[in-house]
């Protein structure tokens, strides 16, 4: 499957981290920003109002994590939590995401950078 077909956007001209998460959710029978009719489905910060809010103590694999990015309040990054690692006094999250160095990859993020953690919504007809 071509990336633009899966995402529904042109990854050359679109910041596509949110489109990737929406595609993963839809392929896994979860509601996405697209399927719930969110007004801004292609923005990472659109996920700030999605699903169930989760604390850092409750986080589990598959939860959605939103991070800040850039200087504008609408900018952000979104990915899926895989696991955490503690190094000294710091906690890091392994995040699976799209548009991380222009590709789908797993990247380590400091827990202090987290804006929100959300639990996905399972579609009712699965």
What are the language-model segments listed below?
Residues 1-61, 71:
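Catalytic cysteine-centered active-site loop
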Residues 54, 71, 75-126:
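Aromatic- and glycine-rich peptidoglycan recognition patches
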Residues 60-64, 91-93:
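Loop/turn elements at helix/coil->beta-strand transitions in domains of secreted/extracellular proteins
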């Amino acid at each position: 499957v071509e990336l633009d077909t899966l995402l529904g956007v042109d990854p050359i001209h679109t910041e596509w981290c949110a489109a990737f998460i929406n595609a993963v959710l839809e392929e896994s029978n979860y509601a996405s920003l697209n399927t719930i009719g969110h007004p801004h489905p292609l923005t990472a910060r659109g996920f700030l109002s999605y699903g169930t809010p989760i604390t850092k103590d409750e986080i589990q694999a598959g939860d959605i994590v939103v991070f800040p990015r850039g200087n504008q309040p609408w900018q952000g990054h979104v990915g899926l939590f895989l696991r955490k690692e503690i190094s000294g006094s710091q906690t890091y999250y392994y995040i699976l995401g799209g548009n991380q160095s222009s590709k789908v990859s797993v990247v380590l993020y400091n827990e202090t950078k987290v804006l929100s953690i959300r639990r996905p919504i399972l579609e009712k007809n699965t």
